[in-house]
Swiss-Prot record:
The keyword Ribosomal protein applies. Belongs to the bacterial ribosomal protein bL21 family. The keyword Cell membrane does not apply. Part of the 50S ribosomal subunit. Contacts protein L20. NCBIfam families: L21 (TIGR00061). The gene is rplU. Pfam families: Ribosomal_L21p (PF00829). One of its GO terms (biological process) is translation. InterPro entries: bL21-like, bL21-like_sf, Ribosomal_bL21, Ribosomal_bL21_CS. This protein binds to 23S rRNA in the presence of protein L20. This is Large ribosomal subunit protein bL21. It comes from Aliivibrio fischeri (strain ATCC 700601 / ES114) (Vibrio fischeri). GO terms for cellular component: cytoplasm; ribonucleoprotein complex; ribosome. Keywords: Ribonucleoprotein, Ribosomal protein, RNA-binding, rRNA-binding.
Length: 103
């Protein structure tokens, strides 16, 4: 059984027991989170596609940890001008473990 749900402006295909990183959620570590923006649920041969959402569809997850991703360097360089600007960015994330999918 797997589901496709939307969180943080992105769509994720998940199954039970899977761990994934989402955009930062404002919840405590160890808390349970429910996602009701479910776009599709597949249970064996039976596939339910929402228009746009599946009625009564829910994905339940447990928050494992919060953290920051790897550093991304941004470099702005102007040739022949002796001008260079360098900046770094680390995006916050929330790691969750999928505990249940219901239709």
């Amino acid at each position: 059984m797997y589901a496709v749900f939307q969180s943080g402006g992105k769509q994720h295909r998940v199954s039970e027991g899977q761990t994934l990183r989402l955009e930062k959620l404002d919840v405590e570590t160890g808390a349970t989170v429910e996602f009701d923006n479910v776009l599709m649920i597949a249970n064996g041969e039976e596939i339910t596609v929402g228009a746009p959402l599946v009625a009564g569809g829910k994905v339940t997850a447990e928050v494992v940890q919060h953290g920051r991703g790897d550093k991304v360097k941004i470099v702005k360089f102007r040739r022949r001008k002796h001008s260079r600007k360098q900046q770094g960015h680390r995006q916050w994330f929330t790691e969750v473990k999928i505990t249940g999918i219901s239709a």
